[in-house]
Amino acid sequence: MAETKIVVGPQPFSVGEEYPWLAERDEDGAVVTFTGKVRNHNLGDSVNALTLEHYPGMTEKALAEIVDEARNRWPLGRVTVIHRIGELWPGDEIVFVGVTSAHRSSAFEAGQFIMDYLKTRAPFWKREATPEGDRWVEARESDQQAAKRW
């Protein structure tokens, strides 16, 4: 039975606490995880903090649709998507994606697909605090290109 966990909120998460739920199914031979962190730099500038905003309800729906699309493309077991919001600092974890499948290729591809689509289709907005002031982070062309390959 396929199971999905989607969480959007300000609370920190623990990769060590998320992994056991992903790994407990004996029918899954592969567990792939990705964790994204706040960098201390972007576009050549120092980043002191990152504020993430979202559209409540719509964001969770968009993430569920992305996971459903991944499930339609690959035979997946469990999927976890966690995305933090609020003010974060360099080194803080922002996003966690965990995917299980019977085989590694499906798990790797689905995890990458989910991240590529999350970056381009989920309604999140980022504002960076730099020494020169705050600025909104615009979508990257490289993220759009990554999503197009699917």
Curated annotation (Swiss-Prot):
There is a cross-link at K119 (Glycyl lysine isopeptide (Lys-Gly) (interchain with G-Cter in MoaD)). CDD domains: MoaE. Its EC number is 2.8.1.12. Pathway: Cofactor biosynthesis; molybdopterin biosynthesis. Induction: By anaerobiosis, repressed by the molybdenum cofactor. InterPro entries: MoaE_sf, Mopterin_biosynth_MoaE. GO terms for molecular function: molybdopterin synthase activity; protein homodimerization activity. The keyword Transferase applies. Keywords: Isopeptide bond, Molybdenum cofactor biosynthesis, Transferase. Pfam families: MoaE. One of its GO terms (cellular component) is molybdopterin synthase complex. GO terms for biological process: Mo-molybdopterin cofactor biosynthetic process. Substrate binds at K37, V38, R39, H103, R104, K119, K126, R127, E128. It catalyses: 2 [molybdopterin-synthase sulfur-carrier protein]-C-terminal-Gly-aminoethanethioate + cyclic pyranopterin phosphate + H2O = molybdopterin + 2 [molybdopterin-synthase sulfur-carrier protein]-C-terminal Gly-Gly + 2 H(+). It comes from the Bacteria. It is an enzyme of class 2 (transferase). Converts molybdopterin precursor Z to molybdopterin. This requires the incorporation of two sulfur atoms into precursor Z to generate a dithiolene group. The sulfur is provided by MoaD. Heterotetramer of 2 MoaD subunits and 2 MoaE subunits. Also stable as homodimer. The enzyme changes between these two forms during catalysis. Belongs to the MoaE family. The cross-link is not seen in all structures of the MoaE-MoaD complex. This is Molybdopterin synthase catalytic subunit.
